[in-house]
Every structure is written in C-alpha cells, then in structure tokens.
Swiss-Prot record:
Record-level GO BP terms: chitin biosynthetic process; glucose 6-phosphate metabolic process; glucose metabolic process; glycolytic process; intracellular glucose homeostasis; mannose metabolic process; UDP-N-acetylglucosamine biosynthetic process
Protein's UniProt name: N-acetylglucosamine kinase
Organism from which the protein derives: Saccharomyces cerevisiae (strain ATCC 204508 / S288c) (Baker's yeast)
EC number per UniProt: 2.7.1.59
Miscellaneous: NGK1 is phylogenetically distant from other know N-acetylglucosamine kinases as well as hexokinases; and the amino acid sequence identity with others is only about 20% or less.
Region entry Hexokinase small subdomain, spans: 51-194
Gene field: NGK1
Enzyme class: transferase
C-alpha cells in the first residue's frame, strides 16, 4: 500500500460522515422545527402565500433590478408567460453608497431603456409609459427594509440612515425623471424589495410543478420553502403582521401557508463533526452546514488539507475557490498541481463534495418532511448558485444519498424573475395599484 493510498483512506474516515443519513435527517428535522419555534435569526417568515390568486394580463411593464454586487442587472419582464423582453447590465464604478449612488444607477437604467424604445420622449407620446418596479437586494436589510451592511467594496454613508431601500430607489426615480422629463416621459412605481433567497423561492414556485424547496448553494448556502401558517409561534406571527401592506386586514388573515427564509447555514452544530481543517474562524462554529457545503468554505478546507499534509507549499499561488474544486472533482486537465499528487488531490476534492452532498441531501429531506410534501415520493428543487450548477458530481451525489427521488432544476435569472413575480402575484391580490 502506497503512502498516498494510506493517506486517502485516512482522509476518507475523517471526512465522510459516520452516522446514517436517516439519523441525520431526523436530527435536522428536530433542529429546523426548534428554530422555527424559538430562533430569531433563522427560520424567518418572509411573506404569506395566498391560497388562490386571480391572474392578470398587465399592459404595464415590470422593470426588475438586481443589486447583487458590483455588476447591476435589470430587465423588462412580461408575466404570466415569464418572458424577458429585454435585459442589460453594467458595472458599478461608484462605491460610495449615498443618494448619488442610486441616482447614477437610475439615470443609467432610464437612459438604456430610452435607447431601446421602452421609454419615449415627451414629444413622441401623449401618455407617459408606466412601469411597476421590483428589486432584488442581496445585502442585509433590517425588518424595516433599511440597509444593515454592504460588503464587496461598497462604503455605506450616514445618509442611508432612516430610509428604506424602497424609499431611496423611488426617490431617485422621481428626481431623475423630473429633471429629464423631456427625455424620460414615464412613471415608475417601486413595489417590492426582496432578498435573493425569496427571489429564488418565488421563481421556483412559479416555474416548478409540485416543488416544495428552493435551494441556494453558491458562496453561501440557504433554502426557502413553505410551511403551514399555523406552525408559526406567536412572536413570529406578530412580526409578520407588521410587515404586511395596509390593504390586509391583519386581524382576519386567511392564509394557509407562509414562506420561510430558513438560513439553513446555521444548522448542524450538534450533528456535523467539523475537522481541524474545516475551521476558518468563528463562522465555522456558527454556520456548520454552510461551512461544509458552500463554494466559499469547502475550497478552503481542501487548501488546509493540502497544506497540512505538505502536498502544496504555503506560498502556493492558486486561489482555492468553487470553480477550482468543481474542476478537480470532474478530474479536468491539470494546470496547477504536481502530476504526482494530482490524482490524490482530485480524490480529496471528491471526498469533500461527497460529504457536502450527504448533508444537503439530509437537510432537503428534513425540509421535505416538515413541509408536508413527502407524499409526492420525489422532491422538485429549483436551485441557484454557481458552485452547485457547475458541479455535475455534486448534483449526482445529492441524488445518490437521498432516499427520495430528487429533481434539481437550475433557475437562470432568478433574481430578476423572482422580483417580477413578487409584484405580479401581489398585484393579482390587489396589493399593488
């Protein structure tokens, strides 16, 4: 037996879970239900799901904007057909987040819509073009919709305090249109600002048949799903009521289900056995499931293993990210490592992904049980995230470890589509005028 085969067997015993997936599913289910009843940072109700919705065929356009980082995306979307009529994107070169930050963004959007015929000049039309606007905002917001923090190189200013993202964007539209009314003859009604997890869930709900779960596995790990409204503890029902539009009679709610932003990255503290190479600071203990499944932390565990066993030098120049791990798992052409170690490195990458897939399969099955959808005998999951999307091995291992048939459907453009769907559904319920 070679040294490398001995090392591979040692790592296999350290990495792959010793417990059965049945036991892990049971423990995850208990933790999900406990967090639903008691936790204030996970298993959070985001919006109510009406039992019946009247369909509409809007003449007004839905403009969706995706604030996801340094590249801003926007689109004109028609529903209920889910047609992206026009989409565009541009880099955000201004990183000071103040009123001028939003003004510049809105001016660029209006300019490009006008150039493509969606906004007319005042002398070209007798009636202003009307748009409903929905926004996906991927940075943390407080319950009032105010910005809590912004990373990725953005610098917040005090001018944001006391204003919601919805108010800031609506104010910028008003300013830009009023100052350029001859060029931008239109009205913009900002309807919704939602986070990316909810956007994925709404897209999944709208596109996938019999779906119960939407999944995000990119640099982070999260899931959204519906549970019966009666599952909510009183303090979460009260908090949800405060977020509802004034058009709701908050005392006579007639809903059976509520959409949950689960923040599943926090799950597994007493279930997932982290190894020394999995420790990347306090975050590993706070978010164990995200630590072992996401495209941000799993690659760093691989790097730590290779350093620990002197397979790579400390000054190794290659960045360990999700893309690299996906290529290693698929045994792509070696362009980074010494050939004598390459087969072992690929094997270690696959072991880490197998562990990730085991826990993803377990959490998905636990969610499936508490949503009450287990009688379908399969789980239809709409998902996003480049880490999962780019790894066929990861997706196949999730299916391998699951005792229920899993269908994974990638939801392209979900941040844009989900925002439009939020406005579409709520306009059907007469929340949007």
């Amino acid at each position: 037996m070679t040294i490398e085969s001995t090392l591979a067997r040692e790592l296999e015993s350290l990495i792959l879970p010793a417990d059965s997936i049945v036991n892990v599913v049971d423990q995850f289910q208990e933790e999900l239900l406990s967090r639903l009843q008691t936790n204030t940072i996970s298993m959070l109700p985001q919006c109510l799901v009406p039992d019946k919705r009247s369909r509409w065929n809007p003449e007004d356009k839905i403009l969706t904007i995706d604030f996801g980082g340094t590249r801003l995306k926007f689109a004109i979307i028609s529903l209920p057909q889910i047609v992206i009529e026009y989409n565009d994107a541009f880099e955000l070169t201004y990183n000071i987040v103040d009123s001028n930050f939003f003004n510049q963004i809105i001016y660029t959007i209006c300019t490009r819509l006008a150039a493509n015929g969606y906004i007319k000049k005042k002398n070209e039309s007798s009636e202003a073009s009307k748009f409903f606007v929905s926004v996906t905002f991927s940075f943390p917001l407080n319950p009032e919709g105010e910005v809590v923090a912004m990373g990725k190189g953005f610098v917040m200013t005090d001018t944001l305090q006391g204003s919601t993202v919805k108010q800031l964007i609506q104010s910028s539209f008003h300013r830009i249109i009023s100052e350029n009314i001859e060029e931008f003859f239109c009205t913009m009604n900002v309807c919704h600002v939602i986070n990316d997890a909810i956007a994925v869930s709404l897209t999944s709900k709208f596109i996938c048949e019999n779906d119960s779960i939407s999944l995000i596995i990119g640099t982070g790990t999260n899931a959204c799903f519906e549970v019966p409204y009666g599952y909510l503890p009183p303090f979460k029902r009260d908090a949800l009521r405060e977020t509802l539009p004034s058009s709701y009679n908050k005392e006579t709610l007639n809903f059976k289900h509520v959409l949950i932003n689960s923040e599943i990255g926090f799950i597994g503290k007493n279930v997932i056995a982290l190894q020394p190479f999995d420790i990347h600071g306090a975050i590993s203990y706070e978010m164990p499931l995200e630590c072992v499944t996401s495209g941000k932390w799993l690659p760093l565990s691989l790097k730590n293993i290779l350093l620990q066993y002197n397979i790579i030098p400390k000054n190794f120049p290659v960045e360990f990210n999700g893309e690299l791990v996906c290529q290693l798992a698929e045994d792509c052409t070696n362009a980074w490592f010494e050939n004598e170690h390459y087969a072992l490195i690929c094997q270690i990458a696959r072991l880490l992904i197998k562990r990730a897939a085991f826990y993803v399969a377990a959490i998905v099955q636990a969610i499936d049980i508490i949503t009450g959808c287990k009688n379908y005998n399969f789980i239809h999951i709409g998902y996003v995230g480049s880490f999962l999307h780019n790894s066929n091995f990861y997706r196949e291992q999730i299916k391998y470890y699951s005792s229920i048939h899993i269908k994974l459907q990638f939801l392209n453009h979900s941040n844009l589509l989900g925002a439009a769907i939020a406005t579409y559904l709520n306009k059907s319920d007469n929340q949007v005028q």
